[in-house]
């Protein structure tokens, strides 16, 4: 873990593309000694959404691949475009409200699970929620994981925490943003353990749907 993680400024942002996220390096834990040395020198890390694998670190000297054949990684093009925008200064200063990522890939994955979007939405009462193009760091959850929220929600959460603290109450978040790929990964792991889609849906919302949006 980067030594400055706990003191990391709360204006940090996660930049989002379809398959890869751009994380501030101080917020990530190294999973191997070689990664630790690189992450200690990095300011940004490209992280695969499906399984959390670190794909590349961005150092002052340039891009450092952390996987073989980085150029062939699915979704690397849009992620590098985001990185170019970051280097060009487009993400400095007050940013515009985040737009939303397209949902085309999600529709295909729901079909692969045998789920009809409209039927599931009607049956569950849940709405399909597009991923935002970027998220704000709202602090850390109960397990000290970075808590990523939409900017307005991050401001509201921090204000609620401060107000509660004045009354002597400590508020902890359980979890924040989860990508569609992360949700899909939960399904894939449970399916591999022999559970059916119907059984998984008793515990987890379908990828792209959320019980925490209204």
Residue ranges and their predicted role:
Residues 178-184:
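Short, well-ordered surface patches within globular domains
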Residues 1-174, 189-214:
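Extracytoplasmic cell-surface/polysaccharide-interacting catalytic and binding patches
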């Amino acid at each position: 873990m980067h030594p400055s993680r706990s003191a990391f400024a709360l204006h940090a942002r996660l930049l989002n593309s379809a398959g890869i996220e751009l994380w501030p390096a101080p917020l990530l834990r190294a999973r191997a000694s070689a990664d630790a040395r690189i992450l200690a020198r990095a300011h940004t890390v490209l992280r695969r959404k499906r399984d959390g694998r670190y794909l590349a670190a961005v150092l002052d000297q340039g891009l450092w691949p952390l996987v073989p054949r980085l150029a062939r990684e699915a979704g690397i093009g849009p992620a590098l475009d985001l990185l170019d925008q970051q280097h060009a200064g487009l993400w400095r200063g007050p940013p515009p409200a985040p737009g939303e990522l397209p949902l085309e890939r999600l529709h295909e994955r729901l079909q692969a699970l045998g789920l009809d979007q409209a039927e599931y939405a009607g049956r569950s009462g849940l709405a399909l929620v597009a991923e935002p193009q970027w998220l704000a760091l709202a602090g850390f959850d109960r397990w000290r994981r970075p808590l990523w929220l939409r900017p307005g929600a991050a401001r509201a959460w921090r204000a609620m925490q401060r107000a509660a603290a004045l009354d002597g109450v400590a508020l902890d978040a359980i979890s924040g943003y989860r990508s569609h790929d992360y949700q899909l990964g939960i399904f894939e792991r449970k399916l591999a353990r022999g559970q059916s889609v119907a059984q998984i849906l008793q515990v987890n919302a379908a990828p792209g749907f959320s019980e925490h949006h209204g």
